């Protein structure tokens, strides 16, 4: 075991001497690394952060612009929907108004047709009544003439006209009753 311990102690300084061959070189390497890190951070990290920050600002600006455009588009859609709804309401109102106007015109036309039919019917009734009166007058005149002729032939004597007319009128009045 001692042999093992001696090899370990003997090997440790070799590793340390292998890792740190020269202390001044090691310190110089550490200082050079620190200087490199400081210089690189000043030359690279700050511009890199600035580029990242600019990129982040550009992305935020684009997102903000997209949100604004989306909002404007939504407002436009709402306006279009409102216009569409107004157009539907207006067209419905126009259709209802047209139906009411058509019903009014239909009623007016039917009323005028009934009035015209009544006028034609009344005129026809008047014409029929006039024709009837005219025919009745002609029939009465014909009957009177036939009666005069018959009476004249029967009596074979001439009776004066006023007396004949009086007799015939009395006869006709008795016929009407």
UniProtKB/Swiss-Prot annotation:
Its main location: membrane. It comes from the Bacteria. Keywords: ATP synthesis, Cell membrane, CF(0), Hydrogen ion transport, Ion transport, Membrane, Transmembrane, Transmembrane helix, Transport. The chain crosses the membrane at residues 19-39. It is a single-pass membrane protein. InterPro entries: ATP_synth_b/b'su_bac/chlpt, ATP_synth_F0_bsu_bac, ATP_synthase_B_chain. GO terms for cellular component: plasma membrane; proton-transporting ATP synthase complex. It is found in: Cell membrane. GO terms for molecular function: proton-transporting ATP synthase activity, rotational mechanism; proton-transporting ATPase activity, rotational mechanism. F(1)F(0) ATP synthase produces ATP from ADP in the presence of a proton or sodium gradient. F-type ATPases consist of two structural domains, F(1) containing the extramembraneous catalytic core and F(0) containing the membrane proton channel, linked together by a central stalk and a peripheral stalk. During catalysis, ATP synthesis in the catalytic domain of F(1) is coupled via a rotary mechanism of the central stalk subunits to proton translocation. Component of the F(0) channel, it forms part of the peripheral stalk, linking F(1) to F(0). PANTHER family: ATP SYNTHASE SUBUNIT B', CHLOROPLASTIC (PTHR33445:SF2). HAMAP family: ATP_synth_b_bprime. Belongs to the ATPase B chain family. F-type ATPases have 2 components, F(1) - the catalytic core - and F(0) - the membrane proton channel. F(1) has five subunits: alpha(3), beta(3), gamma(1), delta(1), epsilon(1). F(0) has three main subunits: a(1), b(2) and c(10-14). The alpha and beta chains form an alternating ring which encloses part of the gamma chain. F(1) is attached to F(0) by a central stalk formed by the gamma and epsilon chains, while a peripheral stalk is formed by the delta and b chains. This is ATP synthase subunit b. It comes from Mesoplasma florum (strain ATCC 33453 / NBRC 100688 / NCTC 11704 / L1). The gene is atpF.
